[in-house]
């Protein structure tokens, strides 16, 4: 991989991991437009590691409180401080984990069809715009009931359909439940941590069964760039979220979906 290839893919991963615009739609489009070959599993693991470090770094203080209070709640046998939010993240991760285990390799391959990605990019783009317009936006992530958490978790499982966008569908679900934009986004990004960890771990295990040559310099550079981009993306997303809302992302998804239909239909 040359520097431009590494730079483009790492920036793309860093930005699309957390913006509600579908990373899979971009990752299928970029190689077609640039004429690049597949970057390999090792590079995918590296850039996901970069985004994982970024989101953990951004929420480091909140995560420390959640971990402390969660451990105290286990010892005390009752909720302590931020322990409920920690349990919420764990419960919200269960559906996507269970569905991911049940999906066969054949099903996963079929879902990677460019037209399926195009349809899900457009369809869930409309849903995101509607949720942002119709949602009451009166609650934060700390007010979620267990039923709410399960609803968001089930919505997150839909992200296994490429083109859906994990952050997009979880933010959409949060807005539908009356969360503020910031509350929906914060819970979505907290949910990203175990999901990226699980996906990256499975990919790393799969990598052990491959014999591909590893370019460690490319992996390190890719992880660094994707991590920096992801951190900046999270920071500025929250900074401008209340001002711009979800409509620009929904419109972008519609345009992206239209381009995918044009190229692959």
UniProtKB/Swiss-Prot annotation:
EC number(s) given by UniProt: 3.6.1.27
Organism listed in the record: Nitrosococcus oceani (strain ATCC 19707 / BCRC 17464 / JCM 30415 / NCIMB 11848 / C-107)
Lineage: Bacteria, Pseudomonadati, Pseudomonadota, Gammaproteobacteria, Chromatiales
PANTHER family tied to this protein: UNDECAPRENYL-DIPHOSPHATASE (PTHR30622:SF4)
Protein name: Undecaprenyl-diphosphatase
Pfam assignment, any one: BacA
Stored InterPro entries: UppP
Subcellular location as annotated: Cell inner membrane
Originating gene: uppP
Residue ranges of the TM segments: 1-21, 39-61, 85-105, 115-135, 149-169, 187-207, 218-238, 244-264
Role description: Catalyzes the dephosphorylation of undecaprenyl diphosphate (UPP). Confers resistance to bacitracin.
UniProt-listed NCBIfam families: PRK00281.2-4, undec_PP_bacA
Membrane-protein topology: Multi-pass membrane protein
A GO molecular-function descriptor: undecaprenyl-diphosphatase activity
One cellular component term from this protein's GO annotations in UniProt: plasma membrane
Record's keyword terms, sorted: Antibiotic resistance, Cell inner membrane, Cell membrane, Cell shape, Cell wall biogenesis/degradation, Hydrolase, Membrane, Peptidoglycan synthesis, Transmembrane, Transmembrane helix
Broad enzyme group: hydrolase
Family in the record: Belongs to the UppP family.
Catalytic activity: di-trans,octa-cis-undecaprenyl diphosphate + H2O = di-trans,octa-cis-undecaprenyl phosphate + phosphate + H(+)
GO biological process: cell wall organization; peptidoglycan biosynthetic process; regulation of cell shape; response to antibiotic
Additional facts recorded: Bacitracin is thought to be involved in the inhibition of peptidoglycan synthesis by sequestering undecaprenyl diphosphate, thereby reducing the pool of lipid carrier available.
């Amino acid at each position: 991989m040359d520097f431009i290839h590494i730079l483009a893919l790492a920036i793309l991963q860093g930005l699309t991991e957390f913006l509600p615009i579908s990373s899979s739609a971009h990752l299928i489009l970029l190689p077609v437009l640039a004429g690049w070959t597949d970057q390999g599993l090792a590079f995918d693991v590296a850039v996901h590691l970069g985004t994982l470090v970024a989101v953990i770094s951004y929420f480091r203080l909140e995560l420390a409180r959640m971990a402390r209070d969660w451990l105290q709640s286990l010892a005390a046998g009752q909720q302590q401080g931020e322990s409920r939010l920690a349990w919420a993240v764990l419960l919200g991760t269960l559906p996507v984990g269970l569905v991911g285990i049940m999906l066969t390799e054949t099903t996963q391959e079929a879902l990677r069809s460019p037209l399926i990605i195009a349809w899900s990019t457009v369809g869930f783009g409309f849903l995101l715009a509607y949720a942002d317009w119709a949602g009451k936006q009166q609650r934060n992530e700390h007010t979620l009931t267990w039923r709410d958490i399960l609803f968001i978790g089930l919505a997150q499982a839909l992200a296994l359909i490429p083109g859906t966008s994990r952050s997009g569908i979880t933010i959409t679900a949060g807005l539908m439940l009356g969360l503020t934009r910031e509350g929906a986004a914060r819970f979505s990004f907290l949910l990203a941590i175990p999901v990226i960890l699980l996906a990256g771990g499975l990919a790393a295990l799969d990598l052990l069964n491959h014999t591909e040559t590893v370019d460690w310099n490319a992996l390190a550079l890719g992880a660094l760039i994707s991590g920096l981009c992801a951190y900046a993306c999270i920071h500025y997303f929250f900074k401008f979220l209340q001002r711009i809302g979800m409509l620009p992302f929904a419109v972008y998804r519609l345009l992206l979906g239209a381009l995918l239909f044009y190229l692959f239909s």
